[in-house]
């Protein structure tokens, strides 16, 4: 009887975790470059009531008798599928059409992002919305002269600047990196990732479109890959799973109460 109670508790905890993940996905449905997460479950150890036996001369073999002891969270995965892009017409909005990540200098290390909503600070340096520097192919910053007439960013990441005298200048090139296992990247907030032991180190910066990286699309933003239809469906499943496991606990409690009443 206690086994069913603990199985129900483990199930409720797991579905609560699933609801937490779904809630975060839905909250970020409009977050630029956001990648949704999912939860997988695995069964816990099973108690063997009777072991199996091999077939004999006069009788066949038997299977083991086992009772499971509940479930636990297996993995919480980040799904790095490419999502739809939205046209903005803004030069500093960049989408990666394929694999790869922008390199960002956070001041205390290098981070990576798919969110390409970039800006220029008062010095003309290309930065994220939080003021972190966007790095070029060589690991340096990208600067646009404050008196430049205009600038553009090509699909290969090259920045072309028309200076105050109307001459075209080379403004550097945005580099894109890849990972052996992008699923292993750690989310650190602000649409940023950090490499982990399981993601492997970032590749050398490649020109967008080379080395397995996607080309850049200026004037576009990659949107979240969250699908509300899928999330609401999973939310219903998680809600029913939570309710069903809570029913296991209440039913087991009622049976235990009946056993206690037998003494009266």
From Swiss-Prot:
Q: Does the keyword Cytoplasm apply?
A: no
Q: Which UniProt keywords apply?
A: Bacterial flagellum
The question of whether Transcription is a record keyword is answered with no
Top-level lineage group: Bacteria
For biological process, the GO terms are: bacterial-type flagellum assembly; bacterial-type flagellum-dependent swarming motility
Name its cellular compartments. Bacterial flagellum basal body
- This protein's major location comes to other
Q: Which is one Gene Ontology cellular component term of this protein?
A: bacterial-type flagellum hook
Instruction: List the SUPFAM superfamilies hit by this protein, alphabetically.
Output: Flagellar hook protein flgE
What NCBIfam families does its record include? FlgEFG_subfam, flgF, PRK12636.1
Q: Which PANTHER family match?
A: FLAGELLAR HOOK PROTEIN FLGE, FLAGELLAR PROTEIN
Subunit? The basal body constitutes a major portion of the flagellar organelle and consists of four rings (L,P,S, and M) mounted on a central rod. The rod consists of about 26 subunits of FlgG in the distal portion, and FlgB, FlgC and FlgF are thought to build up the proximal portion of the rod with about 6 subunits each.
Which family does the record assign? Answer: Belongs to the flagella basal body rod proteins family.
Q: What is this protein called?
A: Flagellar basal-body rod protein FlgG
